[in-house]
């Protein structure tokens, strides 16, 4: 298990997510807002490319391509002097860790990737074995927030007394990479601890808490009815628990709940009383960030105005 004391707050490359940029850009701006107020040393590098995540998991990209793109991104991080890759997306997190391990342990893959770089004149991208460590160079942004939880308490301008908030810890964080989870991978509490620091009342356990969001990448498109039934099962459990706010750490999970909650309500004739945020959006909001200019709530499908009015934000 990963120790919270091992999480760096210096030389972080904030790894941009294509799903964040496309669907919820407020997650990135909220993360930057929070990091700035916590004194985190980070950079965003426009030379970084997509991790291939969804393409990889839907068999559009095979492993060698994903490894080559990861090697390129690792070179970008090292060259700019910010080698601690910090992901906004749990898929980016797992992909980068897997690719790093593959490049370090599989000589054939590493040599093939490097031969392609050299052939095309990109010698500066060549990956040397163990030049990156999947356990000490690749993190999730929620881990950085957790490591700064006491500082977060000091920066709070709005708290959320009595707000029942539930967490959804992404599968690609605590299931796929369970050996690197902070705390118990069978009952992760990272988001809950941060939410509590912001004044919310976390529902630390509810029925179906460890159930996947239902997206499954290709499953949403190939088996949509099954995918949405899984999502509905989770939403039903949250509704029974009286949850007002569901907090996420991955844009893919966020899409599944926020974009498809209205679809499920229409198709199944049900109604849910909860809204959705990424943990960085929630922390930024509690620090006084503008709900639209910083948090980007206008991009959400489930309207947040009722929640924001109830809590006195607007």
Swiss-Prot record:
EC identifiers of the protein: 1.8.7.3
Gene Ontology CC entries for this record: cytoplasm
Effect of disrupting the coding gene: Triple hdrA1C1B1 deletion decreases methane production from methanol, but does not affect methanogenesis from acetate. Deletion results in up-regulation of CoB-SH and CoM-SH synthesis and transport, and methylsulfide methyltransferases.
Gene Ontology annotations of biological process type: methanogenesis
A GO MF label: oxidoreductase activity
Induction info: Induced on trimethylamine or methanol, but not on acetate as the sole energy source.
Superkingdom in the source lineage: Archaea
Catalyzed reaction equations: coenzyme B + coenzyme M + 2 oxidized [2Fe-2S]-[ferredoxin] = coenzyme M-coenzyme B heterodisulfide + 2 reduced [2Fe-2S]-[ferredoxin] + 2 H(+)
InterPro entries named in the record: Cys_rich_dom, HdrB, HdrB/HdrD_reductase
Subunit and partners: The ferredoxin:CoB-CoM heterodisulfide reductase is composed of three subunits; HdrA1, HdrB1 and HdrC1.
Family: Belongs to the HdrB family.
Protein name: Ferredoxin:CoB-CoM heterodisulfide reductase subunit B
Gene for this chain: hdrB1
């Amino acid at each position: 298990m990963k120790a919270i004391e091992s999480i760096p707050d210096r030389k972080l490359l904030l790894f941009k997510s294509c799903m964040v940029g496309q669907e919820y850009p407020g997650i990135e701006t909220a993360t930057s807002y929070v990091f700035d107020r916590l004194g985190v040393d980070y950079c965003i590098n426009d030379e970084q490319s997509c991790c291939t995540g969804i393409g990889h998991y839907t068999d559009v990209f095979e492993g060698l391509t994903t490894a080559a793109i990861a090697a390129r991104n690792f070179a970008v991080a090292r060259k700019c002097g910010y080698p601690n890759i910090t992901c906004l997306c749990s898929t980016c997190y797992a992909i980068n860790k897997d690719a790093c391990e593959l490049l370090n342990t599989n000589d054939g893959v590493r040599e093939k990737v490097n031969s392609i770089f050299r052939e095309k004149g990109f010698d500066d991208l060549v990956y040397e074995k163990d030049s990156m460590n999947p356990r000490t160079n690749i993190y999730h942004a929620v881990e950085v927030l957790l490591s700064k939880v006491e500082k977060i308490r000091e920066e709070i301008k709005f708290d959320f007394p009595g707000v029942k908030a539930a967490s959804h810890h992404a599968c690609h964080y605590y299931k796929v990479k369970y050996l690197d989870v902070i705390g118990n991978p069978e009952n992760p509490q990272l988001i809950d601890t941060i939410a509590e620091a912001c004044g919310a009342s976390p529902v630390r356990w509810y029925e179906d808490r460890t159930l996947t969001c239902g997206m499954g990448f290709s499953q949403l498109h190939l088996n949509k009815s099954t995918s949405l039934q899984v999502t509905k099962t989770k939403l039903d459990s949250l509704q029974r628990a009286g949850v007002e706010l569901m907090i996420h750490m991955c844009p893919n999970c966020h899409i599944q709940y926020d974009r498809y909650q209205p679809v499920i309500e229409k198709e199944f004739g049900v109604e849910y009383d909860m809204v959705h945020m990424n943990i960085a959006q929630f922390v930024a909001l509690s620090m006084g960030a503008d709900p639209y200019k910083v948090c980007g709530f206008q991009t959400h499908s489930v309207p947040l105005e009722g929640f924001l009015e109830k809590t006195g934000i607007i």
